[in-house]
């Protein structure tokens, strides 16, 4: 198992999920879930991101993400406003001051993780690692086509 690449990637993915839960609980508090924080993160860096794009980012269905957005709005983390995109009426999500405070707190902690990683990996190693992960996904996608929700 130790030398099996697929196992190592799966193990790392599971480790990362556990890490995110613990990181969230210890560093960001219980004000939002890891997925909700990912939504805040995405909205901060891409304010025009659509619900469909959020669903792909989170590997969740559009309806599920819609429920999450509604819950986040009811808790005052975001505000959803009617807007148009390509002549289609959509609900655009805007981070509220409360959501911005949570984002800033989490982002500050995230930067500590990023710094730790950069201390241990060169820029070239990071680029190579990212390329290898992309290559792995492309290879296994030729066996079973994974549809993102």
PLM region descriptions:
Residues 1, 123-149:
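C-terminal regulatory/oligomerization modules of transcriptional regulators
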Residues 1-30, 77:
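N-terminal leader segment of winged-helix/HTH proteins
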Residues 5, 34-36, 98, 125:
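N-terminal positioning helix adjacent to the helix-turn-helix/winged-helix DNA-binding module
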Residues 12-23, 58, 102-118, 136-147:
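Alpha-helical linker/hinge and terminal dimerization helices associated
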Residues 20-64:
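N-terminal helix-turn-helix DNA-binding core of bacterial DNA-binding proteins
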Residues 41-45, 107, 134:
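Short, locally clustered residues in the helix-turn-helix/winged-helix DNA-binding domain
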Residues 71-131:
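Charged, amphipathic alpha-helical coiled-coil/dimerization segments
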């Amino acid at each position: 198992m130790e030398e099996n690449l697929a196992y190592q990637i799966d193990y790392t993915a599971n480790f990362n999920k556990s890490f995110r839960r613990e990181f969230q609980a210890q560093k960001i508090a219980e004000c939002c879930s890891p997925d909700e924080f990912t939504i805040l993160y995405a909205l901060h860096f891409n304010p025009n991101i659509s619900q469909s794009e959020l669903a792909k980012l989170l590997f969740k269905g559009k309806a599920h993400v819609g429920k999450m957005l509604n819950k986040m709005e009811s808790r005052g983390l975001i505000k959803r406003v009617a807007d148009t995109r390509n002549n289609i009426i959509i609900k655009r999500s805007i981070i509220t001051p409360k959501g911005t405070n949570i984002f800033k707190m989490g982002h500050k902690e995230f930067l500590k993780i990023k710094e730790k990683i950069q201390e241990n990996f060169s820029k070239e190693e990071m680029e190579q690692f990212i390329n290898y992960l992309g290559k792995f996904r492309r290879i296994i996608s030729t066996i079973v086509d994974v549809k993102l929700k």
